[in-house]
Amino acid sequence: MFCSLRNFLHVNRRFPRHVSPSSSSLSQIQSPLCFPLSSPSPSQSSFISCPFVWFTSFLCIIRYPFVTKSGTSTYSEDFDRDWIRKVVHNDLWDDPGLEKLFDLTLAPIWVPRVLVELKEDPKLAFKFFKWSMTRNGFKHSVESYCIVAHILFCARMYYDANSVLKEMVLSKADCDVFDVLWSTRNVCVPGFGVFDALFSVLIDLGMLEEAIQCFSKMKRFRVFPKTRSCNGLLHRFAKLGKTDDVKRFFKDMIGAGARPTVFTYNIMIDCMCKEGDVEAARGLFEEMKFRGLVPDTVTYNSMIDGFGKVGRLDDTVCFFEEMKDMCCEPDVITYNALINCFCKFGKLPIGLEFYREMKGNGLKPNVVSYSTLVDAFCKEGMMQQAIKFYVDMRRVGLVPNEYTYTSLIDANCKIGNLSDAFRLGNEMLQVGVEWNVVTYTALIDGLCDAERMKEAEELFGKMDTAGVIPNLASYNALIHGFVKAKNMDRALELLNELKGRGIKPDLLLYGTFIWGLCSLEKIEAAKVVMNEMKECGIKANSLIYTTLMDAYFKSGNPTEGLHLLDEMKELDIEVTVVTFCVLIDGLCKNKLVSKAVDYFNRISNDFGLQANAAIFTAMIDGLCKDNQVEAATTLFEQMVQKGLVPDRTAYTSLMDGNFKQGNVLEALALRDKMAEIGMKLDLLAYTSLVWGLSHCNQLQKARSFLEEMIGEGIHPDEVLCISVLKKHYELGCIDEAVELQSYLMKHQLLTSDNDNALPNM
């Protein structure tokens, strides 16, 4: 109502000569708390800054005496100060004069006047203010709040002043609180600390946008908040992750002349480090020192943690050494940051050194220290060490948290030790640590890996009952389990359930479906899933394209496989050595060996890749199967010259190719080379040797390798056994054939059912 009167009567304001406001009008500032103000007119000889002042000026003309008179209900501006002090001091709240004052429609206008009369005694003014609030139907105007805030602040009653300001802001006034506070500033001896208090109150209440607007107005009137208050706003923005607002306000506060403190820089550096912008953090660190501020433990901890999390381990050590050189004592947080970053990037031994140094310096490792090391040992597969630290942790009286337990549970699940995983899970519940979504997901994943899908689904169902909402990782684990079990229908049901919960599938989930469908040779369905993924704005990666390409080659459709390679290049998707291995192997198996050779020769120039052992092996195998044994041998030699170690498959392919060409000596030389380097023959290698030698009429050697094979515990299949026996019969080696047949039946490698497959003699 009062702000409306001010606008209606064109109440304007001008500033005292001792205050130098900005030339721009306050009406330009838009705020949820803002009420438009008219601009000052130079032609006006007087001004009124608020409804209270306007009415009191008006009443100066009327000049009714402020006393109780029969037949009158109007009061003049001349209060009997002693009377009002006496009424308030003695709690004479039923005084007729006071009753009539609050019976008036203009009571909210008169109350500020009474407060001004009582300003010499701030406690009485505050007492009257609080009593007024108890009156039924009465509500203080913004002017009342502002006047009493000024009075209390001048009296250094800061706690009460802050309470009043907070209550005023929460009352959701329909006009700009700052403007009214400014217009009433001369009620007491001018002081601008109350504006900083308003700024702080807005921050404390989480009204950050309003705080920014308040700061802007303070800048216009050259009334600047304290650095401590600015730090409060920076800290709030940083906690909310509003990095852009942090940067913007830091620049504004410096521009307004605020002098940043160590705490200011600590907030900024920590914020930049959490965003991963470590170079910006370094710049602030150097700027801080340039201003003559000395970094403290918090500063160094932020720098060490920030650089450590992005893998800049050398920098973390440099900051750590500088910290000690500056006589800034590292604390447990410092060492925890160092242990974490070195463990995270696979340097567990160095992390352990920092752990020992921490203990050597008399610092006690906390739950975070132990949990970090337990997790690191688990990820390295060093379960005994992980359990040792877990036991030590309990021994020193520390209670493992959900992170500790979940690390151990996840590690046990990954090695298939589900009994210990569930034992730890039960222990976790017994000590009062609830399972979180990560715990459930680890156990579900473990059950799926063990193909215990029924139990996995039951545990998944218990999550909602326990008040734990499954996340994307939980669904990924269960869906992957069903896909691996080839139960695509149930996997699809879970996908729809996931979408119904508002969870968006990610690249991993789509990739799982594509892999599952491709393994079932449902390539078109996999293509549909891939198109859906693209529609959702998720770009397929190299692995997904490689999976689909492999499926096309295996289905005998090399054209589509090559089309996917072209698509990868068009979309700038990385063609990896894995992709290339699938390409070469797929072309060779589809009898497109010349095309495979062409791509192999272009691997460096066109794709920027170096062929690895797997690619060479695929090419060697393809050439051998295409009867190009000489080219395969040349490629084998090139492979060795490049420092690549041929594997068992490469040797077996080349050995098999030589046997097919009748090159028995070359084939046996390859077998001797395998023995020389300690490479044991497997089923395929032995099969190649036995089959090759028998078909080259080297029956004695074939029999020798067959017996060696059986002696090694490698059982030849019946096809090979019958093939060797038939060769004996073909060459007329009847006695040897009968003896061999008896030998094979003795080792249960032939049954009587196979007699029909052998020639009748």
UniProtKB/Swiss-Prot annotation:
GO terms for cellular component: mitochondrion. Gene3D superfamilies: Tetratricopeptide repeat domain. One of its GO terms (molecular function) is pre-mRNA binding. It comes from Arabidopsis thaliana. InterPro entries: Pentatricopeptide_rpt (IPR002885), PPR-containing_protein (IPR050667), TPR-like_helical_dom_sf (IPR011990). One of its GO terms (biological process) is mitochondrial mRNA processing. It holds the Pfam family PPR. The keyword Repeat applies. This is Putative pentatricopeptide repeat-containing protein At2g02150. Belongs to the PPR family. P subfamily. PROSITE patterns: PPR. Keywords: Repeat. Signal peptide: none annotated. PPR repeats lie at residues 141-175, 191-225, 226-260, 261-295, 296-330, 331-365, 366-400, 401-435, 436-470, 471-505, 506-540, 541-575, 576-606, 612-646, 647-681, 682-716, 717-751.
